[in-house]
Amino acid sequence: MTQKVRTRFAPSPTGFIHLGNIRSALYPWAFARATGGDFILRIEDTDVERSTQASVDVIIEGMAWLQLDHDEGPFYQMQRMDRYKEVLAGLQASGHVYPCYMSVEELDALRERQMANKEKPRYDGTWRPEEGKVLPPVPEGVRPVLRFKTPQGGVVAWEDKCKGRIEFQNSELDDLVIARPDGTPTYNFCVCVDDMDMAITHVIRGDDHVNNTPRQIHIFEALGASVPVFAHLPTVLNEQGEKMSKRNGAKAVTQYRDEGYLPDAMVNYLARLGWSHGDDEIFSRAQFLEWFNLDHLGRSAGQFDEAKLRWVNAQHLKALDDAALAELVRPFVLKTGLDQALLDADDRLPRICALFKDRCETLVDLAGWVRLFYVDAFDRNAEDLAKHVTDVVAPALDAFAEGIASVEWSKEAIAALIKEVLKAQGLKMPQLAMPVRVLTLGTAHTPSVDAVLELLGREKILARLKNR
């Protein structure tokens, strides 16, 4: 029987979660969903000084917005300390762990000597017990660290689902500290115990963890646990070509939500930052899950491009049903200060969305257009105003306003009125349409003027044509 896939996302709650982080949640989530497996959320909060509940909340909020649901968790490492110490005691009993009394000062001096000799700085095994070896006398009043006995000789290797075969010489690995003098276990040990206890089958994470992997494989083997399949994802770079991080300006995932991006568009864009399905650039969440596998993970770093993200979002926005889009844009319209009673007074919102969605990249863009149909005061583009609303077209605007006051209210009737005024005034379409657009919506660039005016309504058109 094939083992059920179990993946995990294990962030440290030391700040907000950015796009580089969330991609490391997206792929294991997608792999679990694509294979009928389980996705586990684990919070690695052993850095007590920097970890905060507020950061945990932001992580969960960002994942919830992107609809990256977890089947188990969140589990907190700080709540599992008794379990770690229990497993650690077992490793001590089996001879895989030993106490090391080397002081920080002694370690520093050792490293300085090694570097002076152009050697790789590393622990030299002074306190490692071996047959026939006499250990130094145990110093009084010193609490030891616990070190893991790394196998000597040979290699440790794995077939990485993203990078191919990776191997390390065991001789390059020193004996890892897995418990501090106060008894608290260290990161690499906790991770292995968690993955063992949670039966994780696939570890899909950033390639900054590659150097941890040989050590973790040794710990898994010492525990008698199954070694999971590893996939180390290439780095996500920012627009300047640097590794994306909080320190160099990366935005929180939730900020993209507030800027009007759609969760499915974000999933689409992030999926393409390290995975591909042929030349397909735009796809739904369902298609992504149908297509996703670990065989098509890329090996080179993906570079974030906000212009491309906006384009992807625009494609998803256009594809949305008008009624669904109206519900999504509603809170963004209300954030502009518009009274909800005005928005709910009629059923124009889905039709306005239908008319303008092809011109928008985000829900914030669309909300800006929607607002113009309900407010009394709004800004006009000064350059468009000077260019198009001139004394030459004033008679045509007056004639058009007179016609609007009494015309039958339909898009077709308004279109007929425009043609009638053009003919009577001897003008071409842009000479009337452009100033009407500027006066009624503040810009010369709008969809079809008859469609816009039909939705704007007689009263607002007359007031705006008069105010010139």
From Swiss-Prot:
Its main location: cytoplasm. GO terms for biological process: glutamyl-tRNA aminoacylation. Its EC number is 6.1.1.17. This is Glutamate--tRNA ligase. A motif ('KMSKS' region) lies at residues 243-247. HAMAP family: Glu_tRNA_synth_type1. GO terms for molecular function: ATP binding; glutamate-tRNA ligase activity; tRNA binding; zinc ion binding. It holds the Pfam family Anticodon_2. The keyword Protein biosynthesis applies. It comes from the Bacteria. It catalyses: tRNA(Glu) + L-glutamate + ATP = L-glutamyl-tRNA(Glu) + AMP + diphosphate. A motif ('HIGH' region) lies at residues 11-21. GO terms for cellular component: cytosol. Belongs to the class-I aminoacyl-tRNA synthetase family. Glutamate--tRNA ligase type 1 subfamily. Monomer. It comes from Delftia acidovorans (strain DSM 14801 / SPH-1). Catalyzes the attachment of glutamate to tRNA(Glu) in a two-step reaction: glutamate is first activated by ATP to form Glu-AMP and then transferred to the acceptor end of tRNA(Glu). It is an enzyme of class 6 (ligase). InterPro entries: aa-tRNA-synth_I_cd-bd, aa-tRNA-synth_I_codon-bd_sub2, aa-tRNA-synth_I_CS, aa_tRNA-synth_I_cd-bd_sf, Glu-tRNA-ligase_bac/mito, Glu-tRNA-synth_I_codon-bd_sub1, Glu/Gln-tRNA-synth, Glu/Gln-tRNA-synth_Ib_cat-dom. SUPFAM superfamilies: An anticodon-binding domain of class I aminoacyl-tRNA synthetases, Nucleotidylyl transferase. Keywords: Aminoacyl-tRNA synthetase, ATP-binding, Cytoplasm, Ligase, Nucleotide-binding, Protein biosynthesis. It is found in: Cytoplasm. ATP binds at residue 246.
